[in-house]
Amino acid sequence: MARRPAVLWSAFLAVHAWLAFVGLTHATLPWGDVTLQYRPWVQNALAGDIVGVSHPWVYPLVALVPMLAAMVLGPELYGIGWLLVVVVTNAVVLAFLLARTGPGARLGALKISAAWWWIGFLLLLGPVALGRIDVTTVAISMIALLVAQRRPAVAGALLAIATWIKVWPAVLVAAIVVAIHRRGSAAIAFVASAVALGLGVLAVGSGANSLGFIFEQSSRGLQIEAPVSTVWMWIALVDPASATVQYIPTINTFQVVGAGVAEASALMTPLLVASSASLLVLGALVARSGARAVHLLAPLSLAIVVGLLVFNKVGSPQFVLWIAAPVVLGIATQGRRFVAPAALGAGIAAVTQIVYPFGYDALLALQPWMLVVLTLRNAALVVLFGLAVHMVWRLRRAHGPVRRIHPLPESQVI
């Protein structure tokens, strides 16, 4: 019964309806970004004051496209309009996963398992899984990873679009270039598409504001949910004179303030870049040693993406959604080999929902039980990072025996 498309689609719609209901009605306003930020941006844009064109913006300009689409029902029903955009976007992913899944075929069974995991992951992560612009980039990235080995140019073009919505998918292009044999097609398609989109952005008159998102993000401090902030959150509890939680109204977020915070904040971006670069070098060595792309792409992508979370100074809860793209690829192509990262990723999603939205007031109040929950979540991210790196390294040490796990041959990958 679980393999019937009708059951999957019913679960898909039920989860989206529930998350939208919570997001729009809960007292903590989990979809506040949608109704209190996206809607005014769109209304201003329709009036001629376009973010990313008239002035710098926190996102690349293409992010405005899905926000504009959500205005389909008008400003009063903008939240419902956003839900429609998200449902359509995610429905494309689910339809893609269910395409060509013949009964009894191993490929079909794995893709259905991946679809179920993804739906469950969204439910566990909570309303933030749908109530941020990240949902569009994850959907595009998911399809890009799934087609990367057979259609690398398509993957590159898709990831260029995703990168012009939010920057993080660019690391997936790097992982694809390292892991697959037809790397040139992916790289050329990505660069050509990104440049074409960039020229389009400049054509609407954005000028230097088209790159404003780079400076907007780099100037941020340590957000309270970030793994690196955990130390100062505990210091704020035991010694409020040394560290505190402070609201920053200009970016609508809470950050830690205290001795050493500025220095740590300055270090995080270089550490994040070093992590990604080191993993790409490791991936290149593993690929050169003879590991097949079908084995390598999913764990390498997962390691790099989780590294973005571990070394990120922002640490917003919706970032956890990024994990879904490489895990879905791993389940769809390797099955049981990805049970551990899939289970750990699902657990991280569930704990993240406790942190936000349901426990966020307790976190701001520095209640000890909530700090324990946050610490466990951040520790789990570090564990998942280590697990993914180990999976990549293991391919280099003994990529031959890994075949006993029977991942799909590359000719059968989506």
Spell out what each predicted region is.
Residues 194-221, 229-242:
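Transmembrane-lumen/periplasm boundary regions of multi-pass, lipid-linked membrane glycan transferases
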Residues 1-213, 264-414:
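Multi-pass membrane glycosyltransferase architecture that uses lipid-linked
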